């Protein structure tokens, strides 16, 4: 018994024994030992830059059949590894991309950054860690909504039916402003992607993209720096990151990771704190029941912050330049301005704005840039519209004054629930000229609203900008946020009962939930 215990102790000690911090070089690979207490050691191919092995606490976590890498792999690259004091830097260079992997002595973290001068040929910029799904089966924080193992594809190659539930890797998404950390985990290991810098990504604070996907063969942990997934702006070049892959035994790591040491490591495109400035001020005027966000952007960078409850704000440290500055209530823009940022200083800039309509006859929803409260909005981020857990899409009739907000659909699909009907009662004082304002958040296949008020049909609006991306079926609701005004002639509205129908129109067609559609933000009738 004593002998068996001694052997077990020796085996355990050997498993967790610390090796020296450093690089072991072979003809084909660099092996990087972080000297972390929980033993993190990984191998990088010298020909492709793929991570081909990740050993954490004595256990191989890397998927054996395919590496972890940028995009779908660089194919070939010039790969070097250097050590300087307590830091090791792996550099992978192609004609248009440089990938950095950095470790600090004693830390169980692979810090990364990606510098580009052109968009990758696959049309998106992402890092994907392909890890052992037996050891790391779970996805955090949203659970199995993106676990597609053993599923049957029901839309394209990325939406699946697993048992009675629809699932997709897209259902793992979180708004950039709220996504500082996402993880995959098992009983003995947790791997988290820590994201403290989105400045070179695209889409703004409310954009969202794939975070994880357990497809069975491996569990994928992503950071999408940009993609064509409901993308609303051009891609940015330059340095993306730093972003950090953190390995732990248990517990969720802090998102407060200091990567200022990048300034001393000759990282192309890295701008240290001393070369940055800030914007501080007060936002005012918007609906105080909602979160307020201030957003800055130009062709080179983007930043954002929530304001305090009083409206005060200070931006993150920003690259110098002139920025468009936007103030949101929820996700609805209420003011736009411009500000110039200089290195080493803080610029004071206040901003004010509110939603302006008129004398409201009725309002369905709120001007928050989201389909908040509408039917199926609470589920749409995490399941397909066809899911049995969804409520009936209709067609629905909403009666002002008596219907619940959930009696109004978050989206109208040309082949599913078209049209939406609104019934309301007007007084004689409300029969004059009026405006029906229809706020939308996202359009698919040219879908846009055309309204009929009693016997009067408003003109057909022009087609919105085509983002060329599935949206509502893949858990997205935010696009360009088109708002449509219907001018209603005096006498169209009558004293008593009135009926409005809102049809989705488009020159395109499609089946069920891939038919032309749009998502509602708010509908307001005012004079």
Curated annotation (Swiss-Prot):
Residues 1-19 form the signal peptide. Keywords: Carbohydrate metabolism, Cell wall biogenesis/degradation, Disulfide bond, Glycoprotein, Lyase, Polysaccharide degradation, Secreted, Signal. It catalyses: Endotype eliminative cleavage of L-alpha-rhamnopyranosyl-(1->4)-alpha-D-galactopyranosyluronic acid bonds of rhamnogalacturonan I domains in ramified hairy regions of pectin leaving L-rhamnopyranose at the reducing end and 4-deoxy-4,5-unsaturated D-galactopyranosyluronic acid at the non-reducing end. Its main location: secreted. Pectinolytic enzyme that has a positive effect in the apple hot-mash liquefaction process. This endolyase hydrolyzes the alpha-L-rhamnopyranosyl-(1,4)-alpha-D-galacturonopyranosyl glycosidic linkage by beta-elimination, thereby generating oligosaccharides terminating at the non-reducing end with a hex-4-enopyranosyluronic acid residue. InterPro entries: Carb-bd-like_fold (IPR013784), Gal_mutarotase_sf_dom (IPR011013), Galactose-bd-like_sf (IPR008979), GH-type_carb-bd (IPR014718), RG-lyase_II (IPR029413), RG-lyase_III (IPR029411), Rhamnogalacturonase_B (IPR016590), RhgB_N (IPR015364). One of its GO terms (biological process) is cell wall organization. This is Rhamnogalacturonate lyase A. Its EC number is 4.2.2.23. The lineage of its organism: Eukaryota, Fungi, Dikarya, Ascomycota, Pezizomycotina. It holds the Pfam family CBM-like. Glycans are attached at residue 350. It comes from the Eukaryota. GO terms for cellular component: extracellular region. CDD domains: RGL4_C, RGL4_M, RGL4_N.
